[in-house]
């Protein structure tokens, strides 16, 4: 049974209904419809914290989805799950792959920056300030890219960049 038929959350049900209507009225191939169904089911599973099920659906969606823009969001969501699971190297890989297909994903740049910043903090705890600075510099570069795409967002990152003198804003 498709996940959309077993979900009890009102918002998820509403999303599923709208998605099903769109699948019927928008001219798409059967492969694109199947890819979207897997993507939708992956999002529903992810929203419930069922990450293994979400990953299965996302992997199947990436196998079927041919549009680079749509694939970017699938890859981004896979990155989110790996981030949540503490698998930062895998998460970075999927964020990179998403950005290769869609360079206008500020949230991917932000998440990559957060991972790099975390790694910088871990390096400080291990007493390696040189490695920490390299991670912080990389985080700054990713945050600058996210901020360039959405200047009004990522205020905490903007403040960190100012405080650490890694970026000057007008």
Curated annotation (Swiss-Prot):
SUPFAM superfamilies: TPR-like. TPR repeats lie at residues 35-68, 72-105, 120-153. It holds the Pfam family TPR_1. It is found in: Plastid, Chloroplast thylakoid membrane. One of its GO terms (cellular component) is plastid. InterPro entries: PSI_Ycf3_assembly, TPR-like_helical_dom_sf, TPR_rpt, Ycf3/AcsC/BcsC/TPR_MFPF. It comes from the Eukaryota. The keyword Magnesium does not apply. GO terms for biological process: photosynthesis. The keyword Thylakoid applies. Disulfide bonds: none annotated. Keywords: Chloroplast, Membrane, Photosynthesis, Plastid, Repeat, Thylakoid, TPR repeat. It is a peripheral membrane protein. PANTHER family: CELLULOSE SYNTHASE OPERON PROTEIN C, TPR REPEAT-CONTAINING PROTEIN MJ0263. Essential for the assembly of the photosystem I (PSI) complex. May act as a chaperone-like factor to guide the assembly of the PSI subunits. Belongs to the Ycf3 family. This is Photosystem I assembly protein Ycf3. It comes from Oryza nivara.
